[in-house]
């Protein structure tokens, strides 16, 4: 692999992905030529275009920018595992002997010579990474942070405030996180997921243990209390090394004390609802403290954190009507959203709208999906979002709907979604999924506010 310092041109195949777009922004900010392909135009790709990153939406070799084609010696082609094997642009550039790397490899190269803080976990890593990046940024650290979601604080998935320390989301998909060299790391959860890649939970756990082993002796690993990995423990109301104690809700925010191995910090305030988010905050605080950030500065920085888009994002927040958008696509995440909603709105009728993501995940966790969704007052299911997969015979949203014990349920087509939600008169509507349901949220919001 060439030295990254010699690369002046980058072409990202799948540039609209959350991890890819952060890298594209990073190299653009460094003064390089950056362009890319994606299958569809989204809010994120339009933002990239506004930042003078050229994006094309047709898999056609004739529209690859001339700047890329004419500068092979100092050009790098970056791709994700989601790119199909028969992608014409990708195949063409490989045959022309352009240097090609996976996104995870490039992220590994970027972080290799820097002090690296990495957050892994099947759930919680995006929010934890965003909180950690925010804490370091707000306390004056010279930090670059690659986020797996759009921070509500900066409306971006990239923080660039220097390069003394790098914060990254360490993705277990395709074992990507094994390309990283973290100095400090965290594992927020190790629930079974991505079984299409790993086969079974034991292989997934083995991969997390390999990630944990990458932390050097002079570094530190933080783990959620109870996980089968050794490290400094993080928890809520327990005997963890870092634990939230004396938790109460005041004016819609958490107020709590943080017990650390050396002291207890009183009356921290945090604005995101749900025990899962509180645990994310404790993990980020523990890592920031270990990095050497002042406790006093962290208190102020934590309170100012606004959140991550599509992570319990309020789209409407009125006394009689609440619309929440969330990326939850695993039964554990759905249950966490349910806990947060019930904690904030204990006496209100809650409608859950869920778009399953991947046929394989729907099949592998069908009973757990049915159980977690049944806890809501009413459930609307959309068709399964296939992403990288072909259909699996017998696996459908109708099949999943049959397993939901709650009788207040229905299978809904996207074109009818806004009207169906309007007729429900639910006080709280939660829209969940990792597919394109996020694109439907604005339509639903308009319909509920009678703007449609």
UniProtKB/Swiss-Prot annotation:
Keywords for this protein: ATP-binding, Cell cycle, Cell division, Cell shape, Cell wall biogenesis/degradation, Cytoplasm, Ligase, Nucleotide-binding, Peptidoglycan synthesis
Catalytic activity: UDP-N-acetyl-alpha-D-muramate + L-alanine + ATP = UDP-N-acetyl-alpha-D-muramoyl-L-alanine + ADP + phosphate + H(+)
InterPro entries: Mur-like_cat_sf, Mur_ligase_C, Mur_ligase_C_dom_sf, Mur_ligase_cen, Mur_ligase_N, MurCDEF_pg_biosynth, UDP-N-AcMur_Ala_ligase_MurC
GO CC annotations on file: cytoplasm
Main enzyme class: ligase
EC code: 6.3.2.8
Function noted in UniProt: Cell wall formation.
Protein name: UDP-N-acetylmuramate--L-alanine ligase
């Amino acid at each position: 692999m060439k030295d990254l310092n010699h690369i002046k041109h980058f072409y990202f195949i799948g540039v609209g992905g959350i991890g890819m777009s952060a890298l594209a922004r990073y190299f653009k900010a460094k003064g390089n030529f950056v362009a890319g392909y994606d299958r569809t135009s989204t809010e994120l790709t339009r933002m990239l275009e506004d930042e003078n990153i050229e994006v094309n939406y047709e898999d056609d070799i004739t529209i690859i920018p001339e700047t890329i084609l004419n500068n092979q010696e100092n050009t790098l082609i970056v791709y994700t595992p989601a790119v199909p094997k028969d992608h014409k642009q990708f195949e063409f550039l490989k045959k022309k002997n352009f240097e090609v790397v996976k996104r995870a490899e490039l992220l590994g190269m970027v972080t290799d010579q820097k002090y690296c803080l990495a957050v892994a976990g099947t759930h919680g890593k995006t929010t934890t990474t965003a909180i950690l990046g925010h804490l370091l940024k707000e306390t004056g650290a010279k930090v670059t942070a690659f986020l797996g979601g759009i921070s509500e604080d900066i409306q971006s998935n990239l923080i660039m405030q220097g390069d003394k320390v790098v914060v990254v989301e360490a993705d277990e998909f395709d074992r990507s996180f094994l390309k990283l060299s973290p100095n400090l790391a965290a594992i927020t959860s190790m629930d079974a997921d991505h079984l299409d890649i790993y086969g079974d939970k034991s292989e997934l756990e083995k991969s997390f243990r390999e990630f944990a082993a990458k932390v050097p002796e002079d570094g530190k690993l933080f783990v959620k209390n109870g996980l089968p990995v050794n490290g400094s423990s993080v928890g809520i109301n327990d005997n963890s090394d870092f634990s939230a104690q004396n938790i109460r809700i005041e004016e819609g925010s958490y107020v709590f004390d943080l017990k650390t191995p050396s002291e207890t910090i009183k009356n921290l305030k945090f604005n995101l609802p749900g025990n899962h988010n509180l645990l994310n905050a404790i993990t980020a605080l523990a890592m920031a403290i270990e990095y050497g950030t002042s406790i006093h500065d962290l208190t102020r920085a934590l309170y100012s954190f606004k959140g991550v888009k599509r992570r319990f994002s309020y789209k409407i927040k009125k006394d009689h009507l609440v619309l929440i958008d969330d990326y939850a696509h695993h039964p554990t995440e759905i249950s966490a959203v349910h806990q947060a909603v019930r904690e904030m709105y204990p006496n209100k009728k809650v409608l859950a709208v869920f778009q399953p993501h991947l046929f394989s995940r729907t099949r592998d966790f069908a009973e757990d999906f049915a159980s977690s969704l049944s806890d809501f007052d009413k459930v609307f299911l959309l068709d399964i979002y296939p992403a990288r997969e072909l259909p699996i015979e017998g696996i459908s949203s109708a099949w999943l709907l049959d397993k939901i014990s709650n009788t207040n349920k229905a299978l809904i087509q996207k074109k009818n979604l806004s009207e169906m939600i309007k007729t429900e008169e639910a006080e709280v509507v939660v829209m969940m999924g990792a597919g394109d349901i996020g694109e439907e949220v604005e339509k639903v919001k308009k319909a509920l506010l009678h703007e449609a």
